[in-house]
């Protein structure tokens, strides 16, 4: 009988969006326990070694982390398998670079560079609101932060803007039709659009209908929706493609046009 937590992860069972080749070795880095789920996170080692190519091996990543160069959400993280996830800000002081983990339209974490100004805050989705001991209201976010005494106007599924230095809420966006959102799960993962309406299904999953900038409509579960802006103005900078998923034919035409203009 297995006792205790699992310590290994086979490469073939690793999440697809890490984009690890299956045949080079047997194991993949198993993310530590942390604020994001195993299937929805990106361990630091994969970000530094496979995405940024700052290291060739796991040992090199360990040497970088042990020098305390890497900060996630303003805190130094020396664990190479620390699970960074959606909306996290990764800062590398040595190079002066800041990144925000955001999905591209293919549902993978894009290497999205941001300005030092934007690296001071992050957006969090409100997962739960409850009243704790002595009647103190609490709020729990998608990245497992618990904040006491939030603004009473903030409700579930809203998005709050958090100042990373103080951990305090600076602003919030209501979950409402007409606001810009990003899909963080399901088949439409990584798409960005404006919420058009919400279907309530008591006892089942609420469905949200979204329309992207090209006028394409799609629907997804409420739990997959993350509001990122008021009206159609995003509060964060968006990765290349602005969250608009192209069909295979559109992608081909775009590639050919780029080829002709460069050729």
From Swiss-Prot:
Keyword tRNA processing: no
Gene Ontology MF terms: rRNA binding; structural constituent of ribosome
Job of this protein: Component of the small ribosomal subunit. The ribosome is a large ribonucleoprotein complex responsible for the synthesis of proteins in the cell. Part of the small subunit (SSU) processome, first precursor of the small eukaryotic ribosomal subunit. During the assembly of the SSU processome in the nucleolus, many ribosome biogenesis factors, an RNA chaperone and ribosomal proteins associate with the nascent pre-rRNA and work in concert to generate RNA folding, modifications, rearrangements and cleavage as well as targeted degradation of pre-ribosomal RNA by the RNA exosome.
UniProt KW keywords: Acetylation, Cytoplasm, Isopeptide bond, Nucleus, Ribonucleoprotein, Ribosomal protein, RNA-binding, rRNA-binding, Ubl conjugation
CDD domains given in the database record: KOW_RPS4, S4
Keyword Acetylation: yes
Domain S4 RNA-binding stretches: 42-104
Pfam families noted in UniProt: 40S_S4_C, KOW, Ribosomal_S4e, RS4NT
Protein name (database record): Small ribosomal subunit protein eS4
Compartments in which it is found: Cytoplasm; Nucleus, Nucleolus
InterPro entries, per the entry: KOW, Rib_uL2_dom2, Ribosomal_eS4, Ribosomal_eS4_C, Ribosomal_eS4_central_region, Ribosomal_eS4_central_sf, Ribosomal_eS4_KOW, Ribosomal_eS4_N
Gene3D superfamilies: 2.30.30.30, 2.40.50.740, RNA-binding S4 domain
Cross-link (Glycyl lysine isopeptide (Lys-Gly) (interchain with G-Cter in SUMO2)): 230
GO CC terms: cytosolic ribosome; cytosolic small ribosomal subunit; nucleolus
Native source species: Oryctolagus cuniculus
Single Gene Ontology BP annotation: translation
N6-acetyllysine modification, residue list: 233
Name of the gene this protein is made from: RPS4X
Family designation: Belongs to the eukaryotic ribosomal protein eS4 family.
Subunit and interaction comment: Component of the small ribosomal subunit. Part of the small subunit (SSU) processome, composed of more than 70 proteins and the RNA chaperone small nucleolar RNA (snoRNA) U3. Identified in a IGF2BP1-dependent mRNP granule complex containing untranslated mRNAs.
